[in-house]
From Swiss-Prot:
Superkingdom assignment: Eukaryota
PANTHER family the UniProt entry points to: NADH UBIQUINONE OXIDOREDUCTASE SUBUNIT ND6, NADH-UBIQUINONE OXIDOREDUCTASE CHAIN 6
Localization terms from the record: Mitochondrion inner membrane
Annotated family: Belongs to the complex I subunit 6 family.
Subunit comment: Core subunit of respiratory chain NADH dehydrogenase (Complex I) which is composed of 45 different subunits.
Annotated Gene Ontology cellular component terms: mitochondrial inner membrane
Membrane topology annotation: Multi-pass membrane protein
This protein's name: NADH-ubiquinone oxidoreductase chain 6
Gene Ontology molecular function terms on file: NADH dehydrogenase (ubiquinone) activity
Keyword Protein transport in annotation: no
Listed EC numbers: 7.1.1.2
UniProt main location, coarse: mitochondrion
Key words, A-Z: Electron transport, Membrane, Mitochondrion, Mitochondrion inner membrane, NAD, Respiratory chain, Translocase, Transmembrane, Transmembrane helix, Transport, Ubiquinone
Length: 167
């Protein structure tokens, strides 16, 4: 059941990136990136790495909030173009269906294998990778967390100054 969920999230992730690549309007492009980021983190969480999925989701959405605010402010349209009349998205959907059908016909089955080790043996104790990631993030990786937070702060400040200068 878990692999079916991962497979479904993966297909939706590809459709989210196709929706971004067809980019009918910057507002919809930012929305599709946020949805794709959420689906990517859902894949990580469904593979039992909850902390990594949460951290990536928060950091990614922090960056996407900046980008989404910038694109929405700089390219405001009264009637934004939608995905309905876009030939890029429809041709990508057709290409995806053809590739998936060819893969199924050539292999005879759709099989997804996964070899992920969930536990590390450290000193005779079983320590989950999820919990060791927490200690590494706040231990040796604390400088990276502070640096990323500072970069996001500077970026939002620059975006707000650019948007303020346009009026």
């Amino acid at each position: 059941m878990k692999m079916m969920v991962v497979f479904l999230f993966s297909i939706l992730l590809v459709f989210g990136f196709v929706a971004f690549a067809s980019k009918p309007s910057p507002v919809y492009g930012g929305l599709s990136l946020v949805v794709s980021g959420g689906l990517g983190c859902a894949i990580v969480v469904s593979l039992e790495d909850v902390f990594l999925g949460l951290i990536v989701f928060l950091i990614y959405l922090g960056g996407m909030l900046v980008v989404f605010g910038y694109t929405a402010a700089m390219a405001t349209e009264e009637y934004p173009e939608s995905w309905v009349g876009n030939t890029v998205a429809l041709s990508m959907l057709l290409f995806t269906v053809i590739v998936e059908s060819a893969w199924y016909l050539m292999s005879g089955e759709v099989k997804v294998s996964m070899d992920i080790e969930l536990f590390d043996i450290i000193g005779g104790y079983c320590v989950g990778q999820d919990y060791s990631g927490v200690s590494l993030l706040y231990g040796c990786g604390g400088w990276a967390l502070v640096l990323l937070g500072w970069i996001l702060f500077i970026t939002i400040y620059v975006v707000l100054e650019v948007v303020r200068g346009c009026n």
